């Protein structure tokens, strides 16, 4: 528990910067695009999350685990895993780019009710190699538990991407917001390359070369889990927005997206700490009892924090809306209570689900992701038609 608190404190500055930048971006988007623009931005962000999840499948959790596990033996022990990740990432990137470009017109119609944004989806696809590069480097730093370097590069990337987003929104309105959302993770990839190419482990031979089958297959379960998440969770939220739009309006979808954005922002305090400390820590544990103890100790920190944070957001929701958005978003105040209850349940489920990633419990993880996404869509269809936009939050809590 002490280590988790220490890492949480260490990542506090990064978390605060990310929260601040998230608030600034939300305010700028609200002013220059309104609720309907917020909903459109949410749609493209879900696409970006899905595509990024696909290409990052080989370079994220599996690399964190194996880097943490083999780092004590030196870079030479980690390099085969890194090379395997690069091979997988190249194959998945080529497939993702080809499929997205081929179906860009159809996807644009599904997301935005018109085909004018096919070019935006092509832009998302073409940026994917840089995205997976950034994730690979971040995962290596995380796996090595180089927390200071992790915070440094995270801070720089956050400031750069936020600056690009704000400039594009102010200069070009909703079009600029959509382009910035499509490219921000590629910008992170460039920043990660610039900040890490002098690291002693950053050597071409560590990332490219012959790979034994056992390393490729060793990442296989992590790839299956990540691909499942990429193809279920973000796409389920697209279905949720489409259901809200079909039964209410783009404005209501934007109100819902605003509340969701607030949840994402304050929960980032925990997600950064868990991603930085919890997963690498689980990878080093060898016994069932040690893992159970780690889960219990983590929950002792996470549950009170989640409840207190959700309570603070609820009681100050009017002030939050006033600061972060505009008067057009006042209707969002009625959406907070159920959403925040769902957030508490969600963060607890994260703590419980992380051991599945650490131990590559593929079947259980895949089932849980598909089950969550499917029930979210089905409950949303039912509740939104009965209760309007509030129904989406009841579906999330359920």
What spans do the regions from the language model cover?
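Membrane-water interface segments that mark the loop-to-transmembrane alpha-helix transition
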Residues: 6-18, 44, 56-105, 119, ...
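Signature of the first transmembrane helix
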Residues: 3-64, 97, 101, 161-162, ...
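Interfacial segments at transmembrane-helix termini and the short loops linking adjacent helices
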Residues: 104-124, 250, 296, 314-344, ...
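Hydrophobic alpha-helical transmembrane segments
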Residues: 118, 122, 152-200, 371-375, ...
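Interhelical loop/hinge segments that connect adjacent transmembrane helices in multipass membrane
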Residues: 1-4, 181, 193-235, 280, ...
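C-terminal transmembrane helix end/exit motif
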Residues: 28, 63, 138-143, 147, ...
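Membrane-interface junctions at transmembrane-helix termini in multi-pass inner-membrane proteins
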Residues: 129-153, 341-368
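Helix-loop junctions and terminal segments of transmembrane helices
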Residues: 27, 56-72, 143, 201, ...
């Amino acid at each position: 528990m002490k280590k988790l608190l220490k890492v949480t404190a260490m990542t506090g500055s990064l978390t605060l910067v990310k929260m601040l930048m998230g608030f600034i971006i939300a305010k700028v988007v609200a002013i220059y695009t309104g609720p309907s623009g917020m909903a459109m931005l949410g749609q493209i962000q879900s696409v970006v999350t899905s595509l990024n999840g696909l290409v990052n499948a080989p370079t994220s959790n599996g690399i964190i685990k194996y880097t943490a596990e083999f780092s004590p033996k030196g870079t030479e022990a980690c390099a085969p895993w890194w090379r395997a990740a690069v091979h997988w990432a190249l194959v998945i990137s080529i497939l993702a780019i080809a499929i997205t470009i081929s179906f860009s017109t159809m996807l644009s119609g599904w997301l935005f009710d018109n085909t004018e944004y096919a070019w935006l989806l092509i832009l998302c696809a073409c940026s994917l190699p840089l995205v997976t590069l950034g994730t690979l480097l971040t995962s290596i730093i995380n796996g090595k538990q180089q927390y200071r370097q992790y915070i440094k590069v995270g801070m720089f990337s956050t400031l750069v991407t936020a600056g690009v987003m704000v400039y594009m929104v102010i200069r070009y309105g909703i079009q600029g917001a959509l382009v910035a959302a499509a490219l921000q993770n590629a910008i992170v990839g460039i920043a990660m390359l610039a900040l890490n190419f002098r690291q002693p482990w950053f050597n071409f031979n560590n990332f490219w070369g012959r790979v034994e089958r056992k390393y490729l297959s060793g990442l296989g379960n992590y790839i299956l889990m990540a691909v499942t998440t990429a193809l279920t969770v973000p796409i389920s939220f697209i279905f949720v927005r489409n259901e809200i739009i079909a039964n209410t309006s783009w404005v209501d979808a934007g109100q819902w997206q605003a509340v969701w954005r607030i949840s994402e922002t304050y929960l980032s305090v925990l997600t950064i700490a868990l991603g930085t400390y919890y997963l690498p820590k689980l990878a080093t544990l060898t016994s069932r009892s040690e893992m159970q103890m780690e889960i219990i100790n983590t929950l002792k920190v996470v549950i009170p924090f989640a409840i207190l944070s959700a309570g603070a957001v609820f009681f100050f929701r009017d002030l939050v809306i006033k600061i972060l958005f505009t008067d057009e978003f006042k209707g969002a105040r009625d959406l907070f209570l159920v959403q925040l209850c769902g957030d508490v349940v969600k963060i607890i489920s994260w703590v419980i689900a992380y051991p599945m990633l650490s131990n590559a419990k593929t079947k259980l993880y895949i089932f849980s992701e598909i089950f969550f996404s499917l029930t979210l869509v089905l409950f949303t269809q039912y509740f939104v038609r009965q209760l309007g936009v509030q129904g989406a939050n009841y579906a999330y809590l359920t």
